[in-house]
Amino acid sequence: VTLAFATSCCLSGVVFGWPALAVALKREGAFSSKCADDDDACKSQEVALARVFTIGVLCMFGARLPVGLALDRLGARVTVVITLLGAAIGALLFAANNYAVGFALITGCANGVHVGSMHLAQLFPGKEGSVTTIFNGAHQMGSLVFLAFLGIYGSGASLPAIFRGYAACLAGFALLHGCVIQPP
C-alpha cells in the first residue's frame, strides 16, 4: 500500500499542478517562436500553453473508460504497469519538447495508477473507506509534483533533464509494481 501511495503521489493528480509547470515552460522558452521579439506578454505563447493543458485535461478524463476496461480485462497489475510505462514515455516526449503528446500521455495514464490501486483497500477489511481516502489524498498530492519540478528547475536543472529523471522514476515504479508488489 505504501508503494501504491507513493506512486499515486507521483503521478495521479499531476494535471492539477499545471500552473507551476507553465511557469517553467515560459522560462524555458516553450512556444516562444510564436512571439515577437518585443512582446513581453505573448498571447500566442499563452494560447499554445493553454492548448497543452486542455489536451491534458481531456486525456485525463477521457482515459477513465479505457482504464476501467483494462482493469476488467487485464487486471490491476498489468493496467498499472502499462499506464506507468505510458506515462514514462510521455515524460520522455515532454523532455524532447513534444509537450502536447507528452502531457496527454502523462495525464491520460495517471488514471490507471489511481484507479488501479483502489482495490488494495480490500486488503484491510473494515478499513476500506480509510484506505480509499488515503489514495484520494495521494491523488491530490500529485498536484505538487510540478511545483517540485519548478523548484528543481529554479536551482539550475534543465526541464528536459527533470522530465528524463521523472521518466526513470515512473519506469522504476512500473518495475516494482509489476515484479514485486502489486497483486494480480
Residue ranges of predicted features:
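Intracellular juxtamembrane helix-capping segments at the cytosolic ends
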Residues: 25, 110-134
